[in-house]
A protein has these predicted regions:
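Ankyrin-repeat-protein effector appendages
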Residues: 2-23, 107, 141, 150-153, ...
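N-terminal segments that cap or nucleate solenoid repeat domains
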Residues: 3, 7-57
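Ankyrin-repeat boundary/"N-cap" motif
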Residues: 15-21, 46-54, 80-87, 114-121, ...
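Conserved ankyrin/ankyrin-like repeat signature
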Residues: 32, 65-66, 99-100, 133-134, ...
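Ankyrin repeat domain, specifically the short helix-to-loop turn at the C-terminus of the second helix
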Residues: 35-42, 68-76, 102-110, 136-144, ...
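Alpha-helical adaptor scaffolds
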Residues: 80-108, 112-117
Length: 175
């Protein structure tokens, strides 16, 4: 019984620390993130409350400095958002975070990974949301424009169906 109580207490401490990291990422609190990393906290554990990953939240919310800290601490770039099963690059693309997209690409994230629900790549996400700078960053990173989503659409098809002429121009120029 004593062992069980000791183990339960340790689990509570771990959950509390993990929630602190996610709170610090969400609040863009660089000092707290740095301290948690110095204390040996792993960036590669999902938050127990939200089930999400610090690297995905930092990418989605545009926490550039925090994202750099996480990437330098070897954040796992294969982790997926618990809802859409999307990568950190998908999150950055959907939110229009071009700088974060560039950082993730530079650190070797899989650029053309498809989401399981709609088959979107990060390029599809950026284009569908009208984020031209993010789409440009993903294209410069080497994204394959010929990939089709589950509806059979390329990123160019989506731009055309959205009547987004600036995006169409970018995609045809970058072919």
């Amino acid at each position: 019984m004593r062992f069980f109580k000791k183990k339960l207490g340790l689990i509570r401490i771990i959950v509390k620390i993990m929630s602190k990291l996610m709170s610090a990422v969400d609040a863009n609190d660089k000092a707290t993130v740095e301290q948690l990393l110095r204390d040996g906290y792993s960036v590669n554990e999902a938050d127990q409350k939200s089930k999400n990953w610090p690297v995905i939240i930092a990418a989605f919310k545009g926490r550039t400095t925090i994202l750099e800290l996480l990437l330098n601490a070897n954040a796992d770039l294969t982790v997926l958002d618990p809802g859409m099963q999307a990568t950190a690059l998908h999150a950055a693309a959907y939110a229009g975070r071009s700088k974060e997209a560039e950082m993730l690409i530079k650190h070797g994230i899989s650029i053309d990974q498809k989401g399981p629900f709609n088959g979107y790549t990060a390029l599809h996400d950026a284009v569908s949301q009208g984020h031209i700078d993010t789409a440009r960053a993903i294209l410069k990173g080497g994204s394959d424009q010929t990939i089709k989503n589950k509806s059979g659409q390329t990123a160019l098809d989506i731009a055309e169906s959205n009547n987004d002429q600036m995006m169409v121009n970018l995609l045809t120029k970058m072919e």
